[in-house]
Design a protein with these regions (language model features):
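Auxiliary Fe-S-binding modules of radical SAM enzymes
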Residues: 47, 57-183
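Radical SAM/AdoMet-radical enzyme domain recognition
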Residues: 1-55
Length: 183
């Protein structure tokens, strides 16, 4: 979306050199924009122990106005690459591996297979607000809170988690973009 891809890969390699493990590379799958690059992303798992994750395009932020043709279910990857073998899931990602590959492939399906009921995530925004749901307007400021007050605020955020999203009916309720939320 922004910046230089070579710089991004240099950062990933620097993280590896620093001893970070279980690196995940997320990419939003968009029909007629980057679906011709799926094989390139999959090939990264052949030589690196990374998890390359494909996320379905969600109607939030600037993407909410995009045409529906941009939406491509990530399960399309399974149709195009039948050699992918399913392995144990991890969080919200269904995981696969190419035969002989070092890394894995994750498919995250917020649109085609909603997983809200199993979501155990909360997020803290760059400006210090807790969000119980990626798509909710509800936020709790954590700035200046300590000890019991902080614990109570986090618990409130967890208890406010909705049972599901409404993305198939309308765009996300949050006015924030993913990079503001921490997604």
């Amino acid at each position: 979306r922004r910046g230089d891809l070579d710089d991004a890969f240099a950062g990933i390699r620097a993280a590896e050199d620093a001893g970070f493990q279980n690196l995940k590379l997320d990419t939003v799958l968009m029909g007629d924009l980057n679906d011709d690059e799926i094989e390139d992303f999959l090939s990264l798992t052949k030589e690196h122990p990374w998890e390359v994750r494909f996320i379905e395009l969600m109607p939030m932020g600037p993407c909410a106005a995009w045409p529906k043709e941009r939406f491509l279910p990530v399960t399309e990857i399974l149709n195009r690459f039948p050699a992918l073998e399913e392995i144990e899931p991890n969080g919200v990602a269904r995981r696969y591996r190419l035969p002989g590959a070092m890394g894995t492939v994750g498919l995250i399906t917020p649109m085609s297979h909603e997983f809200c009921g199993a979501c155990r995530r909360i997020r803290v925004t760059a400006d210090g607000k807790l969000k119980g749901c990626l798509h909710s307007r509800e936020e709790i400021s954590l700035r200046g809170l300590h000890g019991r007050e902080l614990e109570d605020a986090i618990l409130r955020g967890i208890l406010q988690k909705p049972k599901g999203h409404h993305l198939t009916e309308h765009a996300s309720d949050t006015p924030r973009t993913m990079n503001e939320i921490g997604g």
